[in-house]
Amino acid sequence: MTISLRNRPVGVAATAAALALTALAALATAAPASASGPAPATALAPASAAPGEPTAPTLPRPTGRYATGRDTLFLTDHTRTDPWVPAAGPRQLLVSLNYPARPGTGGDPAPYMTEEEARLMLAQRGLEDVVPPALVGATRTHARTAARPAPGRFPLVLLSPGFGTPRATLTGLAEELASRGYVVATADHPYESTGTQLPDGRVLTCAACDKVDAQPDDAARREVLAAVPAGRADDFSFLLDRLTGPDPAWRHSRTIDPRRVGMAGHSIGGNAASSTMAADRRVDAGVNMDGTFFDPAPVRGLDGRPFLMLGTDPGHGPGSDTSWDDAWARLDGWKRWLTVRDSGHFTFTDTPEIGEQLGLEDPEAPLSAARSTTITRSYVTAFFDRSLRGRPARLLNGPTPANPEVLFQRP
């Protein structure tokens, strides 16, 4: 679901802030129409506003037994030219690494995003003069910068955000997985987000979005969108080389077990998970959270590797997005197709928590922030526990009374 607020009148600043945060990442989502521009405005109802100025939101605390740390890597792939802006030179990646940490170590809580990145997200919705970008950028996280890693070696999970969406929107899931004993690498793909601020201060905007918008019809837009997950597969193969190869870029690379690698993504990032698995045998398992398969799953399947499709209901139920029906037929390993009642496209990101804390109610996605967070964390973690650790995952065996919103699709 894409929510457009560009032409929506607003009242008090607190209400506008809440509305804006629902659209933090909504440039392009699961369908070509939404990829080419804003969808018609969705009716949004603000809850009763609390008096006073809004305060920075706080992400839900991770539930695992580990404290979490965060490092950031800025990597350059000198073997590839950037596909969206060739004049920029080699392809570059900005990567957040969340990892299990020793308690009591590290510095301040890691930042959510920069103020400029927040401003660009709000500007895309015409709200940069209404919502303080600093409020969005100051969202409170739980990982500590430069914390000492916990002893041991841990499976690696790669995370890829939606098209036009910063990697920050998957921070809550990254921290949860790290607290459960995973190293998590979340990538910003240059020129595929509203704004990515590099360590030297440069800001890269969404040239890929502009290219999609410039196409004359849906078929042409789909062709460009199919290049996004295919290109991200190259990004993640390069990232795997730099994290697990003989000359690793990360100082704590010894904590990664390279024999156990999974990948999850939101929206087109979920398609990138299957594309990366198709291109790189090192990725053992994948999750698509509500993303259309613009780059189809291979006809031959994924060599028996497990895959979870987790989406909105009915938006990604059988027959709603035919790319999911096609992918389901091609997946040749252990697989599950789950949909979530009352959810929206951004249910699987940090957006519900941020919006709800600022008093937002979205009639088209009435699932609460708490349930959105619990469902996403529980099912994604259960899948990786099963696929990368060989642990029983009863949650994935069928419907449970504790999660009545989660539907098991068996087309």
Question: What does each model-found stretch correspond to?
Answer:
Residues 197-255:
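Alpha/beta-hydrolase active-site loop
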Residues 1-38:
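Secretory targeting and sorting signals
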Residues 98-104, 111-127, 169-215, 341:
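Active-site machinery of serine-nucleophile hydrolases
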Residues 138-154, 159-197, 315-318:
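Short substrate-entry loop that stabilizes the transition state in hydrolases
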Residues 239-301:
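Primarily recognizes the serine-hydrolase "nucleophile elbow" in alpha/beta-hydrolase
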Residues 284-347:
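The feature captures the conserved acid-bearing segment of alpha/beta-hydrolase catalytic domains
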